[in-house]
Amino acid sequence: MKFLFDLFPIILFFVAYKVWGIFTATAVAIGATLVQIAWVAFRHRKVDPMLWVSLGVVTVFGGATLVLHNDTFIKWKPTVLYWAFSVVLVVSALGFNKNLIEAMMGKQIQLPHRIWGQLNYVWAVFFVLLGILNLFVAYNFSTDAWVNFKLFGATGCLVVFIVGQSLWLSKYMKEE
């Protein structure tokens, strides 16, 4: 359910793009992210810092898209967000000795410390590569193809990555 909730702004962006075009879709994405944060704040009182980062990035890049009437900025938004996630994972591990992947998933699965460290860096590399792939699609294909990639391609990459990660991790998981 949380996965669908996280996709809420992307799905609305996709639908708005198909009906009204990139500029309306961009405004819808900004509004949907604001609604998403308001809902989380109302329901849980605490908003995840990455959701605030997402709002900042969509507002800055979406705002630039709307003000300058240039869709290049909104196309950069996913890459900036993916690369921000990557930087946060690496800096938290190297600078603060905190493994954020372990902090998020450590209660669900038990893994050796070394594997948590590897997993943290694997996610960081995945986000860098996904950002590069987003730019490749944005600059080499039509806006229509990029919008489809944003919803289906990036989500598909994430699902394939998680399945592959699960297969890799299964040999390290401790029996309960």
From Swiss-Prot:
It is found in: Cell inner membrane. It is a multi-pass membrane protein. InterPro entries: YciB. One of its GO terms (cellular component) is plasma membrane. The chain crosses the membrane at residues 24-44, 49-69, 76-96, 121-141, 149-169. It holds the Pfam family IspA. Keywords: Cell inner membrane, Cell membrane, Membrane, Transmembrane, Transmembrane helix. It comes from the Bacteria. PANTHER family: INNER MEMBRANE-SPANNING PROTEIN YCIB (PTHR36917:SF1), INTRACELLULAR SEPTATION PROTEIN A-RELATED (PTHR36917). Plays a role in cell envelope biogenesis, maintenance of cell envelope integrity and membrane homeostasis. Belongs to the YciB family. This is Inner membrane-spanning protein YciB. The lineage of its organism: Bacteria, Pseudomonadati, Pseudomonadota, Betaproteobacteria, Burkholderiales.
